[in-house]
Amino acid sequence: MKTLLWLFSILFKKLILKRAFPILILSVLFSCNFSKKPKGENTIHIPKKSNILWLVTEDMGQYLPSFGDNTVLTPNLSRLANEGIRYPNVFSPSGVCAPSRAAIVTGMYPSSIGANHMRTTSYTEVTGLPKYEAVPPPEVKMFSELLRKQGYYCTNNAKNDYQFKAPVTGWDQNGKKAHWKNRAQGQPFFSIFNFNVTHESGLFEPYERAIAIPEDIEFRIPPYLPDTKTVRRDLWKMYNNIALMDQQIGKVLKELEDDGLLENTIVFFYSDHGGPLPRQKRLVYDSGIKVPMIIRFPNKIYAGTQDDQLISFVDFAPTVLALSGQVPPDYLQGQAFIGEKQIKRDYIHAASDRFDGFTDVIRAVRDSRFKYIRNYQTEQGYYLPVTYRERIPTMKELIKLRGEGSLNEVQSQWFREKKSKEELFDCLNDPHEINNLANQAEYQNKLIELRNEMDRWLTEINDQPNLPERDLINKLWENKLEKPKTTTPVVSITEGEITIECGTKGASIGYRIVNENASPSAPYQVYTVPFKIEKGNHLEIIAHRIGFEASNPIKYISKF
């Protein structure tokens, strides 16, 4: 209590005349209530087939009061954190959305399934390559399909961006109208709501969004960005977008509560990767891959606590499957971080490859304190003139100041003309990853440890960092000239039961029964076992292996 009173007095003296004062004081109140979750108590017992809700924002680092950044008040997320568990050590495997989302939905590292380049379905023409999709091993499914097989109603509202087209078996509903409200009564659900207001593009001018915070609010300016009017305006836009996102999340949470589902639902909040600013997005520094995550369990289990374990996005799929009562498939490269089957993670891994028309091959491994980075294109600097990023005013400002020679040593680092082959950072004492320790004698044991871990990981997931993208496409397409296509499914009837088969290994089969009472947009069901339909009903069938073209659809009319 004495510490809190002292902190309030300091803040009061410094900020009493600032409009930001009430926001900062309330933020401190929200962020001071966390305790560490007791070690060994990650086995959370909840009813099987609980509802699961994901609230996913874009391009946002840990810029929240509940994660120590008191710049802007986020009452809805602060409430969620106070009623749930805060996870401060969660990492995306890439500093951009599409590879990261591929990892989330498959439980596989992007560079192990051909999802590592940003993007596979666009910008390839800049490099003279065809559009393609990631092609995981045949046993790999979207984990939402596995939930559907267990009776879950699965919806995605509305961003996909998986580096492949989602099979019809992936979701019951997928689009701007997708919602748990559309399920059958009593059916458990897994629902995702995506919020793009915090996306990098939200920094572009003209900025015409609602104003949620004062423009003269105080900011933490990271040392790699200059303190200029332009940078401050972009920071204001970033935090204003976060405040707007919090309002949007509040509306979804209110719907959940109004429907009487809050205490029957596990609620996740996280960002799809780190921050939107230059030297954040697209990089494997913590600023690009470290994200906030909050999980609220029914009845506020472990409310207001913090879990410090290392978590990777590849761990999301096995964790949700475990929470739903399923045993996660062996092919998953991640591991459950909650439940009886959880395994302690010692390292997280990340990668960088092509971004739009530019390629920079980098791999990273991090433990709870140190990060090792391996640069494969040392003759190339870190900064890439990505056209999309050049639209951010701060990026234009950095380029202008670099030309004038006005950037200091730290701010100039990103514009180095060459890179060291290896980098080692103490992320605890150097959170912005400025000081490379790779050549310092006292850190050689740690360097060797993380170097060996990277080699182990690259071998385990069959990552080939030096593989040209053209050769990757040939590998995914098995040296054919065009994207492979799923073979047309075949229907057979035995004693009135319909059996559906597909000759493409790993293809998922979706079907829907169409009669005069059925909606023309009814979701495809996941085919698992033979079934019967009434005479005269129509059956529509599609087969689809991830990364392939979907099969030609077929229609069958029951005559039995």
Residue map of PLM features:
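Short, compositionally stereotyped local motifs that mark structural "simplifiers"
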Residues: 4, 14, 438, 445-452, ...
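Hydrophobic, well-ordered secondary-structure elements that form the walls
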Residues: 320, 424-426, 430, 450, ...
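A structural signal for short secondary-structure junctions
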Residues: 415-419, 503-504
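Acidic glycine-/aspartate-rich tracts in secreted/extracellular proteins
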Residues: 59-60, 429, 515-518
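Bacterial Sec-dependent N-terminal signal peptides
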Residues: 1-47
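Formylglycine-dependent sulfatase
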Residues: 32-416, 431-452
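Short beta-strand-initiation
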Residues: 25, 358-360, 420, 495, ...
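C-terminal substrate/ligand-recognition segments
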Residues: 420-434, 461-466
